[in-house]
């Protein structure tokens, strides 16, 4: 008999035949349907498959998350490296700007200070060295006294020959015994004429001998007799340099008063091979005597683009010019 819990839908009923004809008993055989038998195991297998798939999915997600995390860590490291490099570049750029700005300001300040000191010194020298005469016997420039340490063997455009004669008179023991005071009125009344040596060459004006001295004629005669064969010192120069000295009247005793062309002439006459290439550069920058005295090797190399050897030579000549030795042999 089939249990009450089972239903006819889930079982297969089969009649069992009996071999006894008198027996009216009917027997049935009940079998469970195959679908119902395999139903529960299939559900279990499906659940296990779903669990495995879920585990695989979770593992894949975790693996991808780990990969993403590693990639983010690498990007973070690279960003740190880039940030350090950028900060280093910014610090270097800021340091260079600050250094250049500081040096520029310092040079500007020192340039103004040195320029002011040079102007004051030049004014003092002009006060000490200029004559007290109301008028000068030079047609173009006022005559200044020669310094004791200045070279006397080179004629300069700013000095007339009477200065050379006056220096010779001071050194002459015979003429030094007869000193005479100099008066502006006597000086303005006498006419200064050029004197001639025995060979007929004109050496200059005799105004150095007739500076208001009543005995100027006797002194002149004595001086011309004792020094008839003496000629003013000269320096062997090329024709170009001599022409430059004659044409350019702007080279004076004080380099701070030179014009741009006077500085160019100084470069040409000092060292033509090394300094002539700087002529156009000096003209373009309008470097006059004051600027020439303030030039340094740093300015020549960094701002003007002069080569090292040329800058060293020019600085050497500028130092000699400041010491008053640039015209010495």
UniProtKB/Swiss-Prot annotation:
Metal-binding recorded as keyword: no
GO molecular function, one term: histone binding
Region (Disordered): 138-157
Cellular component GO terms, alphabetical: nucleus
Protein's cellular compartments: Nucleus
Residue runs in coiled coils: none
Stored SMART domains: SAM
Phosphoserine found at: 138, 238
GO biological process terms on file: negative regulation of DNA-templated transcription
Tissue: Ubiquitous. Expressed in fetal and adult tissues.
Pfam short name (any one): SAM_1
Domain SAM intervals: 258-325
Entry keyword set: Nucleus, Phosphoprotein, Repressor, Transcription, Transcription regulation
PROSITE patterns in the record: SAM_DOMAIN
InterPro entries: SAM, SAM/pointed_sf, SAM_Scm-like
General function of this protein: Putative Polycomb group (PcG) protein. PcG proteins act by forming multiprotein complexes, which are required to maintain the transcriptionally repressive state of homeotic genes throughout development. May be involved in spermatogenesis during sexual maturation.
Similarity comment: family membership: Belongs to the SCM family.
Protein name, per record: Sex comb on midleg-like protein 1
Gene this chain is encoded by: SCML1
